[in-house]
Regions:
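A structural signal for short, well-ordered beta-strand segments and their strand-loop junctions
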Residues: 68-71, 147-149, 209-214
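Short linear interaction motifs
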Residues: 37-38, 83-89, 124-132, 179-183, ...
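Interdomain/boundary linker segments immediately adjacent to catalytic/signaling cores
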Residues: 1-101
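Conserved catalytic cores of phosphodiester-cleaving nucleases, focusing on short active-site segments
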Residues: 60, 103-129, 133-184
Length: 311
């Protein structure tokens, strides 16, 4: 799959759930076709991903104790122009780097900020990071305390139906604690296809990976090692979902949904994002509406800061 399509692939189950959770958003009426038509759903996915990563970077940097930068291509790519975003991934593909999996963010102690900024200037800016092989980035990577894989969901976590429900023994888990398969609650998500490359990246670079999942009102974190343990011990089972790529193709993929009970509280929203109507006009004059997220604020919680200080 082309890297542009992989980044903007949408779980059809997530689309259905997100629509049920945010019925008041009128732009959800626009479900057009993919990459060739610049479908509004995929423009929305692009805007959503930009928002989530920026939100986490801003929240981390606002602590004045840690410094986060985008590292994976979804975060270093242009964020204000979807066509430039696509061309960025075309360039990655042309350079033979399109299928390389990297975490989305690197997080450093604030004392490393001068070094990090100087390093980024020396390579031509953070947007050049995905075009440089990691053997030439070790000086930067080695300074990081963690790497972050970003996920996001269009849900108000505290209003999800199974939020605050305790885990109980489940037959499908062999009597181990869990929740019904159909329970709708905040989860931290990892795709099966990402587990091996993320594990390899963590092992090769000796930097722990955490998954940070952003909701409208909260954010949760889970270490990759803990996620692996939960799967190994049979506490979390894979779920198969159908994903639609921007070219219209659908594929079945296994994902792991980790109950928020297993995660640590990462952040809380102090300001909700505004949903700003936007559109693009294609070369044929076709108008495609979508929504941009603007003007929100997330604070990193003391529990998460305590975890980061351990590194």
């Amino acid at each position: 799959m082309h890297p542009f399509e992989r980044v903007l692939s949408v779980s059809t189950e997530d689309i259905e759930l997100e629509l049920r959770g945010v019925k008041e958003i009128s732009w959800a009426d626009f479900w057009l076709n993919p990459r060739k038509l610049r479908g509004s759903d995929f423009l929305m996915r692009w805007s959503q991903g930009v928002w989530a990563e920026k939100r986490l970077i801003d929240a981390t940097n606002k602590t004045n104790q840690f410094y986060a930068i985008p590292y994976g291509p979804s975060g270093t790519a242009p964020t204000n122009d979807v066509r430039a975003f696509e061309l960025y991934f075309e360039r990655l593909e042309a350079d033979g780097l399109g299928n390389i999996k990297r975490p989305d963010l690197l997080v450093f102690k604030i004392a490393e900020k001068p070094f990090v900024d100087k390093f980024l200037v020396s390579i031509g800016g953070e947007e050049e990071l995905p075009f440089i092989t990691e053997d030439k980035l070790q000086e930067l990577i080695s300074k990081a305390i963690i790497a972050v894989e970003c996920e996001n969901s269009l849900w108000v976590a505290a209003k999800m139906p199974a939020y605050n429900l305790p885990m109980k023994p489940q037959k499908r888990l062999g009597g181990k604690l869990g929740l019904p398969k159909v329970a709708v609650l905040p989860t931290v998500i990892i795709k099966e296809e990402d587990r091996i490359p993320l594990s390899r990246w963590q092992q090769e670079n000796k930097i722990p990976i955490h998954v940070w999942h952003v909701f409208f009102d909260k954010a949760y974190g889970l270490s990759f090692d803990e996620a692996q343990r939960l799967v190994t011990e049979g506490l979390i089972l894979p779920t198969e979902q159908v994903f639609q790529a921007p070219d219209g193709a659908t594929t079945k993929k296994a994902i792991y949904k980790y109950y928020y009970h297993y995660a640590y509280p990462l952040g809380i929203a102090t300001e909700r994002p505004q949903l700003i109507p936007a559109f693009i006009e294609d070369k044929n004059g076709h108008i495609l509406p979508y929504v941009k997220f603007e003007g929100d604020s997330l604070d990193i919680l003391p529990e998460a800061i305590k975890i980061l200080k351990q590194f």
